[in-house]
Amino acid sequence: MYRSHTCGELRVEHAGQEVLLAGWVHRRRDHGPLIFIDLRDRYGLTQVVFDSAAAPTAHAVATDARIEYVLQVRGRVVQRPEEAYNPDLATGMIEVHATEATILNPAKNPPLYINKEGGEDETIRLKYRYLDLRRERMQRNIILRHRIVKFIRDFLDREGFVEIETPILIKSTPEGARDYLVPSRLHPGKFYALPQSPQQLKQLLMVAGFDRYFQIARCFRDEDQRADRQPEFTQLDMEMSFVDQDDVLDIIERLFTALCREITPHKRLLTPFPRLTFAEAMERFGSDKPDLRYGLELVNLGETVATSSFGVLRAALDNGGQVKGLRVPGAGHYSRKQIDEVVDLARQAGAKGLLWAIVPEMGGEVRSSFGKQVSPDEMTAIIRRMEGAPGDLLLIVADTPKIVAQTLDRLRREFGARLNLADPNTLAWAWVLDFPLVEWNDEEQRWDAVHHPFTAPKDEDLHLMDSDPGKVRAKAYDLILNGYEAGGGSIRIHQRDVQQRLFDLLGIDRETAMRQFGHMLEAFEYGAPPHGGIAPGIDRICMILADEVTIREVMAFPKTQQAVDLMTNAPSPVDERQLRELHIALRLD
């Protein structure tokens, strides 16, 4: 036996007992005759005292021990003097007086600090991830993730869901991103794909009669690693039969309300989850995933400036664009240099420029970038419409709806952070509903599915699919948490004729549809029930609940933003023999 107790287990009631501990040397303090070692495992720390007079052999071992050595210690639990209590440790009222000690394995000097945050470059942390994972913060995050997944499994089991594993080697079909392809040795020239999601398989499980399915699913997407993405990720994949949209939203809301109250009881949970339509979210926030922990809502100035003498404003409206503003409370003290930096942010977001005005104190003069282009009455009307108060900074964008939305969304998030408006201890879940079914792809001159090609259109919009597809709303819904998309889902098409109509709209001809999705179309002819589902992202939800800023901090072995595993050096070349077995020849041009 290597240990009788863990390093986080011993308390005052164990005083007088002989115990056996094993762990890593976390800290070592050498006071000559006395050596103090904090012994660590994932459960905590225990202070071990090595006395040269009482146990010279054990003291000699402690003399040789260094940081991160693996150590086994036998000793007696002793209550510390009251003045020596350490309130920061669960074991802080006791210490172990060593009688025997063994170095189970020495350790080289680690390239990063284990016993504190070292601020080293992330590449070092990822290269030596097995050391990084020894840190208290990382172990706390991984254990939090375990608790979240276990809670989900237990909750859904009580709700009558069945966990079913779907294949990892599947057929390659277009789902938005590029597939990771796996060559078949037994079938030369043919390939499997790693699933971007189990979407089609879970729908087929509904046809099979498993009316409540879930899976903690690994998914793979070979896409450019923009922002905080990973080539492989984990989602809670769910599907239900004989449900409408409200049924899906209800069970997810109950799941995550219960989960947050159990896992993060210290956080303020806003319930019930607000429901916004896609159009409302874009109008009020310029985003389909708004952070609802703070206001800073956008203001539509279309009517206010409809007859403006300022050509920039009028031209935007005449060309089908928008004029919207953002009121930033208390930012009127900004210097011209600071305002120029904000203008640069707007340009980075796609705007040609940014209009600004500072609301003066009573009787003062408005400072602005466009005061000479509008009349005093028009400026007053703009300030009144934006509910500007003295000392506020008003920001205005006039452009296409897309540019206006993405620019003001960028500025809203920027000032939400600068003004500390988002309470880190608040969880603001929300639903965004009624997304467009399709969107026009200017580059390829065709309609694309906004979510995926199996999303059902709203019944009342079916008649528009041929005449005005852009106005067709989908039975789709996104789950939002603190400004992040935490998951997406929809009610699915379950009738072959409707599915074929959508394929036709997307430019997928009948032959291609049968080749790529024939298994789905045929299944719909064998009594497919109405069904719908959702797939919340485990990595993202864990990140937010752990108060981290990147999903890499809640994954055991993540890859870099360039999809490289620095620890194992994957991807890596393979030898010619393996390629020949797979009938593959490389062409690197």
Curated annotation (Swiss-Prot):
<dbReference type="InterPro" id="IPR002312">
    <property type="entry name" value="Asp/Asn-tRNA-synth_IIb"/>
</dbReference>
<dbReference type="Pfam" id="PF00152">
    <property type="entry name" value="tRNA-synt_2"/>
</dbReference>
<dbReference type="InterPro" id="IPR045864">
    <property type="entry name" value="aa-tRNA-synth_II/BPL/LPL"/>
</dbReference>
<comment type="similarity">
    <text>Belongs to the class-II aminoacyl-tRNA synthetase family. Type 1 subfamily.</text>
</comment>
<feature type="site" description="Important for tRNA non-discrimination">
    <location>
        <position position="31"/>
    </location>
</feature>
<dbReference type="GO" id="GO:0006422">
    <property type="term" value="P:aspartyl-tRNA aminoacylation"/>
</dbReference>
<feature type="binding site">
    <location>
        <position position="230"/>
    </location>
    <ligand>
        <name>ATP</name>
    </ligand>
</feature>
<dbReference type="InterPro" id="IPR047089">
    <property type="entry name" value="Asp-tRNA-ligase_1_N"/>
</dbReference>
<comment type="subunit">
    <text>Homodimer.</text>
</comment>
<feature type="binding site">
    <location>
        <position position="451"/>
    </location>
    <ligand>
        <name>L-aspartate</name>
    </ligand>
</feature>
<feature type="binding site">
    <location>
        <position position="175"/>
    </location>
    <ligand>
        <name>L-aspartate</name>
    </ligand>
</feature>
<feature type="binding site">
    <location>
        <position position="485"/>
    </location>
    <ligand>
        <name>ATP</name>
    </ligand>
</feature>
<dbReference type="InterPro" id="IPR004115">
    <property type="entry name" value="GAD-like_sf"/>
</dbReference>
<keyword id="KW-0436">Ligase</keyword>
<protein>
    <recommendedName>
        <fullName>Aspartate--tRNA(Asp/Asn) ligase</fullName>
        <ecNumber>6.1.1.23</ecNumber>
    </recommendedName>
</protein>
<dbReference type="InterPro" id="IPR029351">
    <property type="entry name" value="GAD_dom"/>
</dbReference>
<feature type="binding site">
    <location>
        <begin position="221"/>
        <end position="223"/>
    </location>
    <ligand>
        <name>ATP</name>
    </ligand>
</feature>
<feature type="binding site">
    <location>
        <position position="221"/>
    </location>
    <ligand>
        <name>L-aspartate</name>
    </ligand>
</feature>
<feature type="region of interest" description="Aspartate">
    <location>
        <begin position="199"/>
        <end position="202"/>
    </location>
</feature>
<dbReference type="Pfam" id="PF02938">
    <property type="entry name" value="GAD"/>
</dbReference>
<dbReference type="GO" id="GO:0005737">
    <property type="term" value="C:cytoplasm"/>
</dbReference>
<keyword id="KW-0648">Protein biosynthesis</keyword>
<dbReference type="GO" id="GO:0003676">
    <property type="term" value="F:nucleic acid binding"/>
</dbReference>
<dbReference type="InterPro" id="IPR004365">
    <property type="entry name" value="NA-bd_OB_tRNA"/>
</dbReference>
<dbReference type="InterPro" id="IPR006195">
    <property type="entry name" value="aa-tRNA-synth_II"/>
</dbReference>
<dbReference type="InterPro" id="IPR047090">
    <property type="entry name" value="AspRS_core"/>
</dbReference>
<dbReference type="InterPro" id="IPR012340">
    <property type="entry name" value="NA-bd_OB-fold"/>
</dbReference>
<comment type="function">
    <text>Aspartyl-tRNA synthetase with relaxed tRNA specificity since it is able to aspartylate not only its cognate tRNA(Asp) but also tRNA(Asn). Reaction proceeds in two steps: L-aspartate is first activated by ATP to form Asp-AMP and then transferred to the acceptor end of tRNA(Asp/Asn).</text>
</comment>
<keyword id="KW-0030">Aminoacyl-tRNA synthetase</keyword>
<dbReference type="GO" id="GO:0050560">
    <property type="term" value="F:aspartate-tRNA(Asn) ligase activity"/>
</dbReference>
<feature type="binding site">
    <location>
        <begin position="537"/>
        <end position="540"/>
    </location>
    <ligand>
        <name>ATP</name>
    </ligand>
</feature>
<dbReference type="InterPro" id="IPR004364">
    <property type="entry name" value="Aa-tRNA-synt_II"/>
</dbReference>
<dbReference type="Pfam" id="PF01336">
    <property type="entry name" value="tRNA_anti-codon"/>
</dbReference>
<dbReference type="InterPro" id="IPR004524">
    <property type="entry name" value="Asp-tRNA-ligase_1"/>
</dbReference>
<keyword id="KW-0547">Nucleotide-binding</keyword>
<keyword id="KW-0067">ATP-binding</keyword>
<dbReference type="GO" id="GO:0004815">
    <property type="term" value="F:aspartate-tRNA ligase activity"/>
</dbReference>
<keyword id="KW-0963">Cytoplasm</keyword>
<feature type="binding site">
    <location>
        <position position="492"/>
    </location>
    <ligand>
        <name>L-aspartate</name>
    </ligand>
</feature>
<dbReference type="GO" id="GO:0005524">
    <property type="term" value="F:ATP binding"/>
</dbReference>
